[in-house]
From Swiss-Prot:
Its cofactor is Mn(2+); Mg(2+). PANTHER family: UDP-ARABINOPYRANOSE MUTASE 1-RELATED, UDP-ARABINOSE MUTASE. The conserved DXD motif is involved in enzyme activity. Glycans are attached at residue 148. It is found in: Secreted, Cell wall; Cell junction, Plasmodesma; Golgi apparatus. It comes from Solanum tuberosum (Potato). This is Probable UDP-arabinopyranose mutase 1. It comes from the Eukaryota. Homopentamer or homohexamer. GO terms for cellular component: cytosol; extracellular region; Golgi apparatus; plasmodesma.
Length: 365
C-alpha cells in the first residue's frame, strides 16, 4: 500500500534563517523531507552552509538578496533572524512554515514525537473564532465543539491566517526575565489551540510559526533589526502587531497553542539585553499605538492596509526616535519589493547565481 501524500506537499515552503550548518534537519527529516526548504543565510555570504543530503532546497545569501532586490534590499535586515522574511517574499507557495535552527522535535506526554508541521497545517485549514470566544477553545478540533450560548450565526468562523506554535524547554523570554530566571524551563504541555480574540494583541514568536501567504503574506515583514539598527529581537513581535491589526480589520483569525517544538538552547541574556534595551522602553508606547490603530474601510487588501499602517507609524511613532521614520519607509519599500517580485514572475531569475536558477527552474517552471 502506497504511503499517504503529506498534507500540502506542493503548497507549502519551509523557511529557515541560519548562520550555521543545518545538522538539526536530521531530526526533522521524517516530517520535513517531503517539503521544499527556503534557507536564508545571514552573515558572511562567503561561508558555506552545509545541508544534509536528501532535502529539496534553495539557499539565498546576502549577495543573492542584493542581486534580486537591488536598492530595495535595504529593507531586509542583516545579521538578524529578521532576514527570514526574504524567504516569504520569494516563495511561490500558498503556505509558509518557519522554524529556527535551534528548534528540535518535541515529544508529547505519551513520549511520541510531535509532527509540528502537521499540526500547523491542521490549524491553518480549520476556521478561527476571533469574534466570540469559545470556552472549549478550538471548536473545530476532534472531540470539541461550540459550547452552549455560542451564536449559531458565528459558527462558520473566519479564515485562519496564522498558526502560532509554542516551545518546550527554553522559554521565549526577554533579557531581564532571562537574567532573573536563568534556569527556568517550560515543561508544561498544554493540549490546546485557541483563537486570539479580535482587538487583542499578542507577542508573536517567529521560531515556530506558520501562515497562509495568500491571506496575510505581505504583512509578515520582520522590520529593520540587527546590523546598523538601534534595536533587535523585536522583529517577529513587530510583524505580529502589524499582522494582528490587519487580520482584525480584514476579518481573519490567528491561532496559538499547539504545536510544540523543543527549543534547545538559551541565547546570551547580556547580548540580548543590549539588543532589546531600546525596545523595552519603546514598547510601552508602541503597543498603545497598535491598540488604538484603525484602518479605513477603503483598505481591502493586505498591501493597502500595510501601507496605511506605515503612514501611521511615521506620523505617530517618529517622535519616539527617528528610527521609526526609517522603519515606516522600509515598510513601504517592503511592499514595493513584494509586489514587484510576485508580479514579475520569472524575470528576477536572471539575478540569481546559476546554481540557484537551476534549482528554481527544476522546481517551479
Amino acid at each position: 500500500m502506497a504511503a499517504a501524500t503529506p498534507l500540502l506537499k506542493d503548497e507549502l515552503d519551509i523557511v529557515i534563517p541560519t548562520i550555521r550548518n543545518l545538522d538539526f534537519l536530521e531530526m526533522w527529516r521524517p516530517f520535513f523531507q517531503p517539503y521544499h526548504l527556503i534557507i536564508v543565510q545571514d552573515g558572511d555570504p562567503s561561508k558555506i552552509i552545509k545541508v544534509p543530503e536528501g532535502f529539496d532546497y534553495e539557499l539565498y545569501n546576502r549577495n543573492d538578496i542584493n542581486r534580486i532586490l537591488g536598492p530595495k534590499a535595504s529593507c531586509i535586515s542583516f545579521k538578524d533572524s529578521a532576514c527570514r522574511c526574504f524567504g516569504y517574499m520569494v516563495s511561490k507557495k500558498k503556505y509558509i512554515y518557519t522554524i529556527d535552527d535551534d528548534c528540535f522535535v518535541a515529544k508529547d506526554p505519551s513520549g511520541k514525537d510531535i509532527n509540528a508541521l502537521e499540526q500547523h497545517i491542521k490549524n491553518l485549514l480549520c476556521p478561527s473564532t476571533p469574534h466570540f470566544f469559545n470556552t472549549l477553545y478550538d471548536p473545530y478540533r476532534d472531540g470539541a465543539d461550540f459550547v452552549r450560548g455560542y451564536p449559531f450565526s458565528m459558527r462558520e468562523g473566519a479564515p485562519t491566517a496564522v498558526s502560532h506554535g509554542l516551545w518546550l524547554n527554553i522559554p521565549d523570554y526577554d533579557a531581564p526575565t532571562q537574567l532573573v530566571k536563568p534556569h527556568e524551563r517550560n515543561t508544561r504541555y498544554v493540549d490546546a489551540v485557541m483563537t486570539i480574540p479580535k482587538g487583542t494583541l499578542f507577542p508573536m514568536c517567529g521560531m515556530n510559526l506558520a501562515f497562509d501567504r495568500d491571506l496575510i503574506g505581505p504583512a509578515m515583514y520582520f522590520g529593520l533589526m540587527g546590523d546598523g539598527q538601534p534595536i533587535g529581537r523585536y522583529d517577529d513581535m513587530w510583524a505580529g502587531w502589524c499582522t494582528k491589526v490587519i487580520c482584525d480589520h480584514l476579518g481573519l483569525g490567528i491561532k496559538t497553542g499547539l504545536p510544540y517544538i523543543w527549543h534547545s538552547k538559551a541565547s546570551n541574556p547580556f547580548v540580548n539585553l543590549k539588543k532589546e534595551y531600546n525596545g523595552i522602553f519603546w514598547q510601552e508606547e508602541i503597543i498603545p499605538f497598535f491598540q488604538a490603530a484603525t484602518l479605513p474601510k477603503e483598505c481591502t487588501t493586505v498591501q493597502q492596509c500595510y501601507l496605511e499602517l506605515s503612514k501611521q507609524v511615521k506620523k505617530k511613532l517618529s517622535s519616539i526616535d527617528p528610527y521609526f521614520t526609517k522603519l515606516g519607509e522600509a515598510m513601504v519599500t517592503w511592499i514595493e519589493a513584494w509586489d514587484e517580485l510576485n508580479l514579475l514572475g520569472t524575470t528576477w531569475l536572471s539575478c540569481l547565481s546559476p546554481m540557484v536558477q537551476q534549482r528554481l527552474k527544476s522546481r517551479c517552471y
